[in-house]
């Protein structure tokens, strides 16, 4: 417990908020009579309640400090009084170390929306990209299809598609590059697309807008034809099958629509 005191003190000094996992076994470890005492000892922001707590205990604790519930196991109708009387109620999805055990999108969305409709903030996990946690080292995402993609891409999908309230990195390591991209979006609201262009280099570092009438299968750039010079010719080049994620520009065969991206 001495190491925990040192670690938590340092984290608080650095401006972090600490969410501590606690169970009834934690009382024995710290030799205290309530988990609220643990929260005071370590100066944590919120407690994530594991197994062993009855509803009355959760309600009493929720009135004193933020608590985090397991999003996968709680029933909304059972925690209405916690939301009504508690200081702050959050629900955290699990992360899944083993491949093929992460949540599917439909189930995740159903749970997330029902919790948010009840006034509960939802937290989910993305994998790291530098240091993966053992013993399996396959990432710690909430959603299975995030397991082998970049933390930035996983963060953007959780934020923009699923509208989760907070995103945590499950693994111990995430690169400075990925942190910078995530922070940039949080600061500016602009989505960064890392790409190497063989042509149309004038698009580098340009901020463009997605057309609001883009269909679900493509994203059209609003300013694309405005960026094309009047006398510019776009010859056919690399006219292969367009894979998911491909960025293409219409060539001269599209006549006055040439240049659309």
State where each predicted segment sits.
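C-terminal functional modules
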Residues: 196-261
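Detector for Asparagine
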Residues: 12, 70, 94, 237-238, ...
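N-terminal start-of-chain detector that recognizes signal peptides
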Residues: 20, 63-64, 95, 137-141, ...
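Context-gated lysine
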Residues: 2, 17, 25, 40, ...
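Electropositive, surface-exposed helix/loop patches at the edges of structured domains
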Residues: 18-37, 44-59, 106-110, 160-169, ...
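Catalytic alpha/beta core domains of metabolic enzymes, predominantly
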Residues: 70-199
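Active-site beta->alpha loop and helix N-cap motifs at the rims of alpha/beta catalytic domains
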Residues: 1-84, 88
């Amino acid at each position: 417990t001495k190491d925990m005191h040192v670690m938590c003190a340092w984290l608080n000094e650095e401006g972090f908020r600490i969410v501590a996992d606690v169970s009834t076994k934690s009382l024995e470890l710290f030799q205290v009579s309530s988990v609220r005492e643990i929260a005071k000892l370590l100066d944590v922001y919120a407690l994530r309640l594991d197994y062993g707590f009855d509803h009355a205990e959760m309600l009493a604790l929720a009135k004193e400090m933020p608590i985090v519930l397991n999003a996968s196991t709680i029933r909304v109708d059972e925690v209405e009084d916690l939301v009504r009387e508690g200081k702050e109620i959050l629900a955290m999805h699990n992360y899944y170390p083993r491949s093929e055990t992460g949540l599917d999108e439909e189930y995740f969305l159903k749970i997330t929306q029902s919790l948010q409709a009840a006034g509960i903030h939802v937290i989910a996990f993305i994998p790291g990209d530098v240091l993966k946690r053992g013993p399996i080292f396959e990432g710690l995402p909430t959603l299975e299809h995030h397991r082998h993609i970049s933390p930035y891409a996983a963060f953007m999908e959780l934020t923009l598609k699923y509208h989760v309230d907070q995103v945590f990195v499950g693994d111990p390591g995430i690169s400075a590059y990925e942190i910078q991209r995530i922070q940039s979006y949080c600061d500016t609201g602009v989505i960064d697309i890392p790409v190497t262009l063989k042509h149309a280099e004038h698009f580098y570092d340009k901020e463009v807008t997605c057309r609001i009438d883009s269909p679900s299968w493509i994203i059209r750039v609003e300013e694309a034809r405005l960026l094309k010079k009047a006398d510019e010719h776009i010859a056919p080049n690399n006219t292969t099958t367009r894979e998911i994620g491909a960025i293409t520009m219409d060539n001269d065969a599209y006549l006055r629509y040439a240049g659309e991206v």
